[in-house]
């Protein structure tokens, strides 16, 4: 069960299913408890007790390394990013808007998950779409004569000191402004911070991170409703008129309105890079 610092369950007041409510509902409940200063804890003492080490050895070891004994103590918890349901726009065969480039897995937005992924469906998506992409790539004509591109230097190395500090700032901004509970003012503030960080980025890693952050934040700002894992405190209701995927071209991200999804068929003109939410 989930409890606050006083040992009181808080999900029972938020949803009839309590801790078994949809993951977005539970996540908002946890975030609200933490923001209110009550704290949030996973209490497995009754459900597992002495069986915890055998049932969840990895979690148990991590708790013990942090000085927590889950057999006798509730475990402090907080929301964390787990899965991104948006991504690069693809059709049902993983084709992107760039000819010859396919995307599959969490990087792609196939629409298979809707607004709130069901448990384990990401694995099913990866298996199904990987097979479809492989078949489509194998059937595609091989084009010759293109000069081989110079590979970028992506060898692992610590980022420059200024980039390391910027990464910390970017992560804090995304958690605070583009996290579980969002609003227009916070998203606008996040975009401004992201632009500042991007302007000083030196490493490919930070440039990629700011690109992803910009796209996610702009898409969240454009969707003026709450749906699944996307919750806007200033637009808490679900808008039936927005029951479709939205496309955010890579470019002027601050003013991109959502529009109905299209399939990337033959001859469809599409922006060179886009993401969906």
From Swiss-Prot:
Positions contributing to FAD binding: 106, 122-123
UniProt keywords, alphabetically: Cytoplasm, FAD, Flavoprotein, Nucleotide-binding, Oxidoreductase, Pyridine nucleotide biosynthesis
Entry's EC annotation: 1.4.3.16
Compartment list: Cytoplasm
Ranges annotated as biased composition (Pro residues): 146-161
Active-site positions on this chain: 23
Biological process per Gene Ontology, one example term: 'de novo' NAD biosynthetic process from L-aspartate
Protein's pathway: Cofactor biosynthesis; NAD(+) biosynthesis; iminoaspartate from L-aspartate (oxidase route): step 1/1
Listed Pfam families: FAD_binding_2 (PF00890), Succ_DH_flav_C (PF02910)
SUPFAM superfamilies: FAD/NAD(P)-binding domain, Succinate dehydrogenase/fumarate reductase flavoprotein C-terminal domain, Succinate dehydrogenase/fumarate reductase flavoprotein, catalytic domain
Primary subcellular site in the record, as a coarse category: cytoplasm
Cofactor: FAD
GO CC annotations, alphabetized: cytoplasm
Top-rank taxon, per record: Bacteria
Enzyme class, first EC level, given as a word: oxidoreductase
Record's catalysed reaction(s): L-aspartate + O2 = iminosuccinate + H2O2
Region (Disordered): 142-161, 234-277
Gene3D superfamilies xrefs: FAD/NAD(P)-binding domain (3.50.50.60), Fumarate reductase/succinate dehydrogenase flavoprotein-like, C-terminal domain (1.20.58.100), Succinate dehydrogenase/fumarate reductase flavoprotein, catalytic domain (3.90.700.10)
Cofactor binding remark: Binds 1 FAD per subunit.
GO terms, molecular function: L-aspartate oxidase activity; nucleotide binding
Entry's family note: Belongs to the FAD-dependent oxidoreductase 2 family. NadB subfamily.
Functional note: Catalyzes the oxidation of L-aspartate to iminoaspartate, the first step in the de novo biosynthesis of NAD(+).
Full protein name: L-aspartate oxidase
Native source organism of the sequence: Rhodospirillum rubrum
Gene for this chain: nadB
């Amino acid at each position: 069960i989930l409890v606050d610092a006083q040992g009181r369950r808080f999900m029972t007041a938020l949803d009839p299913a309590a801790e078994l409510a949809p993951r977005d509902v539970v996540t908002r409940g946890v975030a609200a408890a933490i923001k209110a200063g009550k704290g949030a804890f996973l209490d497995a003492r009754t459900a597992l007790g002495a069986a915890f080490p055998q049932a969840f050895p990895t979690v148990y070891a991590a708790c013990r390394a942090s000085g927590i004994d889950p057999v006798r103590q509730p475990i402090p918890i907080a929301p964390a990013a787990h899965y991104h349901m948006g991504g690069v726009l693809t059709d049902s065969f993983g084709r992107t808007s760039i000819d010859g480039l396919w995307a599959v897995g969490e990087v792609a937005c196939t629409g298979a998950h809707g607004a709130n992924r069901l448990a384990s469906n990401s694995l099913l998506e990866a298996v199904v779409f990987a097979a479809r992409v492989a078949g489509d790539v194998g059937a595609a004509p091989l084009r010759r004569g293109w000069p081989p591109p110079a590979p970028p230097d992506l060898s692992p190395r610590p980022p420059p000191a200024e980039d390391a500090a910027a990464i910390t700032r970017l992560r804090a901004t995304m958690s605070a402004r583009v996290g579980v509970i969002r609003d227009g003012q916070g998203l606008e503030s996040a975009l401004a911070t992201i632009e500042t960080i991007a302007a000083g980025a030196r490493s490919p890693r930070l440039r990629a991170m700011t690109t992803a952050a910009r796209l996610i934040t702009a898409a969240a700002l454009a969707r003026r409703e709450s749906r699944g894992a996307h919750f806007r405190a200033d637009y808490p209701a679900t808008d039936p008129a927005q029951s479709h995927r939205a496309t955010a071209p890579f470019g002027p991200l601050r003013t991109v309105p959502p529009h109905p999804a299209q399939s990337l068929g033959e001859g469809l003109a599409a922006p060179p890079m886009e993401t969906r939410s």
